[in-house]
């Protein structure tokens, strides 16, 4: 496999001010740290339960294990974590034999991800993290990765077609892509604009800067992958497997939500609205895990490489 080469020029960055503001807000940092232990993705439960504890094993092991299973690459594979956040997924992948190159645009998250790698004793060959925008992968060599994955990060894409074309270019033939993301069950245009839940779901996507979440409906990701050139697309519905954490978040925020709504300032706490509307509106969206392949021979084990 070719090395992950970069050009001398600095990677192009989209100055997404709103996205940076969301992740740098005290609301987001406190919620993710206190409730999620820093992890920025849902957990995975094999069976529904009203007692989802302990959260850590479901957040940092079960979901990451499921992602690794569906990515289905041999140990030693070089993978791109597009939108790596604080690096918990990348760390898990590296600890289980992958060589991970994580990219993100949020400065504090990049520093946390690097610290996570260092604290885990991972070499830069096993896990490295750089500031880079997944819409602009021109500084990465073509066919330099065995796979790419996103974990609840592609919803932030402002140009999903461009980002997907970049993923396709950097993945070698036979390589894989796995995406764990959110899509609507029906297009937004079919929702009643005067319905409060409709308004809150749109507010969440707007305030958390997730235009692709707002646009995505059934077959959206399948079509996006196929248009980019990927084949053998498989879409899995994992929403039943995240219900325990959706229900937990809902139970934690309902009393403060009603209080702040009484005074008309609930919009100041967007993660609270996200937790409320996510569970209340769960019949309107799906949590999907999508995989696809770039046509070519199946990748071999990298033990000898």
Swiss-Prot record:
Gene Ontology MF terms: sterol 24-C-methyltransferase activity
The keyword Iron-sulfur appears for this protein: no
EC number of the protein: 2.1.-.-
Pathway annotation: Mycotoxin biosynthesis
Top EC class, one word: transferase
Source species, domain of life: Eukaryota
InterPro entries registered for this protein in UniProt: Erg6_SMT_methyltransf (IPR050447), Methyltransf_11 (IPR013216), SAM-dependent_MTases_sf (IPR029063)
Catalytic activity line of the entry: 3-[(2E,4E,8S,10E,12Z)-4,8-dimethyltetradeca-2,4,10,12-tetraenoyl]-4-hydroxy-5-(4-hydroxyphenyl)-1,2-dihydropyridin-2-one = ilicicolin H
Keywords assigned by UniProt, alphabetized: Transferase
Cofactor: S-adenosyl-L-methionine
Transferase found in the keyword field: yes
Segment forming the signal sequence: none
CDD domains, alphabetized: AdoMet_MTases (cd02440)
Pfam short name (any one): Methyltransf_11
GO biological process: ergosterol biosynthetic process
GO cellular component: a single term: endoplasmic reticulum
PANTHER family, A to Z: HYPOTHETICAL LOC100005854, ZGC:194242
Family stated for the protein in its record: Belongs to the class I-like SAM-binding methyltransferase superfamily. Erg6/SMT family.
Reported function: S-adenosyl-l-methionine-dependent Diels-Alderase; part of the gene cluster that mediates the biosynthesis of ilicicolin H, a 4-hydroxy-2-pyridonealkaloid that has potent and broad antifungal activities by inhibiting the mitochondrial respiration chain. IliD catalyzes the Diels-Alder reaction that converts the acyclic 2-pyridone intermediate to 8-epi-ilicicolin H. The biosynthesis of ilicicolin H starts with formation of the tetramic acid by the hybrid PKS-NRPS synthetase iliA with the partnering trans-enoyl reductase iliB since iliA lacks a designated enoylreductase (ER) domain.
Protein name from the UniProt record: S-adenosyl-L-methionine-dependent Diels-Alderase iliD
Taxonomic source organism: Hypocrea jecorina (strain QM6a) (Trichoderma reesei)
Organismal lineage: Eukaryota, Fungi, Dikarya, Ascomycota, Pezizomycotina
């Amino acid at each position: 496999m070719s090395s992950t080469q970069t050009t001398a020029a600095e990677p192009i960055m989209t100055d997404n001010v709103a996205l940076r503001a969301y992740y740098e807000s005290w609301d987001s940092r406190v919620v993710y740290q206190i409730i999620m232990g820093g992890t920025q993705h849902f957990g995975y439960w094999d069976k529904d339960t009203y007692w989802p504890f302990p959260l850590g094993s479901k957040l940092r092991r079960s979901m990451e294990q499921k992602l690794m299973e569906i990515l289905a690459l041999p140990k030693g594979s070089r993978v791109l974590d597009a939108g790596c956040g604080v690096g918990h997924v990348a760390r898990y992948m590296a600890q289980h034999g992958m060589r991970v190159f994580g990219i993100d645009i949020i400065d504090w998250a990049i520093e946390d991800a690097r610290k996570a790698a260092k604290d885990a004793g991972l070499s830069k060959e096993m896990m490295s993290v750089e500031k880079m925008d997944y819409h602009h992968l021109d500084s990465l060599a073509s066919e330099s990765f065995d796979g790419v994955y996103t974990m609840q990060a592609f919803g932030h894409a402002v140009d999903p077609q461009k980002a997907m074309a970049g993923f396709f270019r950097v993945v070698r033939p036979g390589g894989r892509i796995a995406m764990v993301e959110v899509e609507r069950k029906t297009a937004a245009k079919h929702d009643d604009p005067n319905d409060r839940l409709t308004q809150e779901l749109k507010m969440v996507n707007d305030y958390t800067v997730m235009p692709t979440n707002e646009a995505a409906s059934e077959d959206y990701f399948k079509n996006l992958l196929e248009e980019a050139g990927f084949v053998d697309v498989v879409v899995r519905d994992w929403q039943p497997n995240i219900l325990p954490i959706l229900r937990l978040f809902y139970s934690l925020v309902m009393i403060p939500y009603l209080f702040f709504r009484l005074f008309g300032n609930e919009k100041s706490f967007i993660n609270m609205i996200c937790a409320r509307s996510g569970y209340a509106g769960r019949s309107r969206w799906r949590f999907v895990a999508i995989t696809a392949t770039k046509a070519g021979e199946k990748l071999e084990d990298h033990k000898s490489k």
